[in-house]
């Protein structure tokens, strides 16, 4: 049994999610210790419990240590399954972080998969659901992995109540390598500004602010930010909550950024923050924003051939994913061909193992 130290790197939930996904696919029993050792509340929280339950269901896994606050987990996968599944985090815990653990597994499921998850769609310390819909989904399509994300209802901290459906109609069973080095010319910028259980002007001000910052730095580039808002009598959300996601469609890639509303935070600051983060990442010229560059590493390790990932910033999450891949997928070869220092832009060459479910 492989032992993974959950305190390495960022020492949070990322190690758990990547370990679960890779162990499920490769059929490797793992024991994860020191789970979330570097967090104020160590051990498994509700969102992590749901991640474990979800991957365990799809991998027919036997699990030990599945309880709130547990710092040790044993995960023994016994074969991938397809079908329809339902998971309720029970709080405003992040749906997108559960998806982060689940998505790689669904790419290799024996048949169609549909998963409904209840929790938070737009919550702190995790990618918003619109980032997954409009950025990550497009990047994973380049690996040959296509799926649908249906947002039935948004959920914000602290009440949650969001409902998202993941639908994988045709799991690819094999991933293509990608060359995502430079982004190329920025063709257009799109976005979505939402506000639920709040006045319409919140969504409008977020969008206007983001658009103004982007126009000042990207002259001549078409910019379009849509609004999502609901009449109070027809608003199905628990709310209140708001946020904006913006993404640049470039010749060779898509890069995204986001910002969440918060009590006391002006809507203008929300829009400005999202736009400035996107501009920072675009300024590097790389194909991937600071978030996507860590999320794609496990996929590249499983792909058939050599991928190159050019990231705007080497985050601790990316470094952590590299270390977990080294432990669980030793056949994957990884080397920095540019950069390699934290918080600097980088290019990573990944020679994947051409994983197939029967292998």
Curated annotation (Swiss-Prot):
- Which reaction does this chain catalyze? a 3'-end 3'-phospho-ribonucleotide-RNA + ATP = a 3'-end 2',3'-cyclophospho-ribonucleotide-RNA + AMP + diphosphate
Enumerate the residues binding ATP: 100, 291-294
Q: Which UniProt keywords apply?
A: ATP-binding, Cytoplasm, Ligase, Nucleotide-binding
Q: What is this protein called?
A: RNA 3'-terminal phosphate cyclase
In terms of superkingdom, the source organism counts as: Archaea
Pfam families the UniProt entry points to: RTC, RTC_insert
Chief site of localization:
cytoplasm
Any single GO BP term = RNA processing
Which catalytic residues are annotated? 317
Give an example GO cellular component term for this record: cytoplasm
Which InterPro entries does UniProt cross-reference here? RNA3'-term_phos_cycl_insert (IPR013791), RNA3'_phos_cyclase_dom (IPR023797), RNA3'_phos_cyclase_dom_sf (IPR037136), RNA3'_term_phos_cyc (IPR000228), RNA3'_term_phos_cyc_type_1 (IPR017770), RNA3'_term_phos_cycl-like_CS (IPR020719), RNA3'P_cycl/enolpyr_Trfase_a/b (IPR013792), RPTC_insert (IPR036553)
Give yes or no: UniProt keyword Repressor.
no
Question: What's the Enzyme Commission number for this chain?
Answer: 6.5.1.4
